[in-house]
Every structure is written in structure tokens, then in C-alpha cells.
Design a protein with these regions (language model features):
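Non-catalytic signal-transmission and effector/linker regions of two-component phosphorelay proteins
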Residues: 1-9, 116-132
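Receiver (REC) domain active-site loop signature in two-component systems and cognate sites
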Residues: 62
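Alpha4 helix (beta4-alpha4-beta5 surface) of REC/receiver domains from two-component response regulators
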Residues: 69, 92-109, 120-123
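Helix N-cap/capping motif at the beta->alpha junctions
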Residues: 37-46, 67
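Two-component/phosphorelay signaling modules centered on CheY-like receiver
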Residues: 17-36
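Short amphipathic alpha-helix used as the core "switch/output" element in two-component signaling
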Residues: 46, 68-81
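Active-site beta3 strand of CheY-like receiver
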Residues: 51-57
Length: 132
């Protein structure tokens, strides 16, 4: 069963335009979610505060401010502490579940990714039952 909700907003923070296009297309077609994009962690932080997304998809390796620095900056703001974050990264094989869970991250998706895996990880972060 596919979970759909036009009201869900996903903030994608990734410095690669091709990744942004693929993720946006997948999520808008598969789940009819709205995808807000940011090409840097700094821009993502501003958009997270302004948009209050339902989930943040976050790349780890970015110039200037990486994904870990973004989390530090995001979670010092009390109103942002409850937004689920899912890593979308080429470094997935280097991270163990206990590592990202201690950071407060709800999941990790390896690049390249399968669209259904992407959808399931976000749905899981939203605590939705996919009925699989």
C-alpha cells in the first residue's frame, strides 16, 4: 500500500542538482509530496526554519557546512528538534545504525537509491505504517 499525502513537505538538502531532480521527481510522483530544495546546508537551515518541513532529507558531504554541522545548527533551535531527519548519502556504508541514531537521525539512504526505498525511509520517519 502506498502512502500518499499532498500535505507532506520534504526538505531536500543536497549540493548535486541531478540528485535533487531525481529525488524530487520520485517523491512527487510516488507519494505526491511537495519537495523543497536547498543546494547547501546554510540555505537548508534557512528553509528549514522558514518552511517547517515534515521531514528533512540531508546529504552529509557538502562544502562549507556538512550534514553533521547542519544538525548541530538545526537542533539548537527548540522548535526544530522534532523534525525527522534522514541521511541521503554516498557514505551510507561507513555509518552503522547506532552511529546515526545517536545523532537523532531517523534513517539513512545510500546513493544511488531505489525510489521505493527512498519512499519507505521517509514514511518510516513519519511513523507511517506502509502495510508491507
Amino acid at each position: 500500500m502506498m502512502v500518499t499525502s499532498a500535505s507532506k513537505r520534504i526538505l531536500l538538502i543536497d549540493d548535486e542538482p541531478d540528485v535533487q531532480r531525481v529525488v524530487q521527481t520520485c517523491l512527487e510522483k510516488l507519494a505526491q509530496w511537495t519537495v523543497i530544495t536547498a543546494t547547501s546546508a546554510e540555505e537548508g537551515l534557512l528553509k528549514a526554519i522558514a518552511e517547517q518541513p515534515d521531514v528533512i532529507l540531508l546529504d552529509i558531504m557538502m562544502p562549507k557546512m556538512d550534514g553533521y554541522m547542519f544538525l548541530d545548527a538545526l537542533w539548537v533551535k527548540p522548535e526544530m528538534q522534532f523534525i525527522p531527519v534522514v541521511f541521503l548519502t554516498a557514505q551510507a556504508g561507513l555509518l552503522k545504525p547506532h552511529h546515526y541514531e545517536t545523532l537523532g537521525v531517523k534513517g539513512i539512504i545510500a546513493k544511488p537509491f531505489d525510489p521505493l526505498t527512498l519512499h519507505r525511509a521517509i514514511a518510516s520517519a513519519l511513523n507511517w505504517d506502509l502495510g508491507t
